[in-house]
């Protein structure tokens, strides 16, 4: 039932779109007060890394948040001075945020900072830590459409059509 009450249906379409167009997609899964929360993340926001088994186990995500959203998410007291000032004067001014999600090594679990998967948020300009937590298991699903053995990122079907598209564009320039 928790799955049915979630926003999965809205987010899975974005995931499939990114997967077919770019060859790699990312879906973040978290819990909030209402239950499961899914969030498709654009491939331009993330960098991924694989473990020895070829599974994605590390994601670095760079994105923007308003000063208001940062205060709601991390607490005003945890923001750098520049974000605190913006919260007072221009709460909708955007700031860069980096979210790092990676395995803690040999951690067997626990609570918060002792969980098996680390989750750290930093302010993108000041590099001040905004918040740290963790997950019991890796919270990103990162499907790749077609991947060869030496690549981390996937290839999409659109990459096969790209040379033909470029040729047709050139042909239309010449005939116009």
Model regions: which residues?
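Extended alpha-helical, oligomerization-prone segments that build pores/tubes and scaffolds
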Residues: 1-176
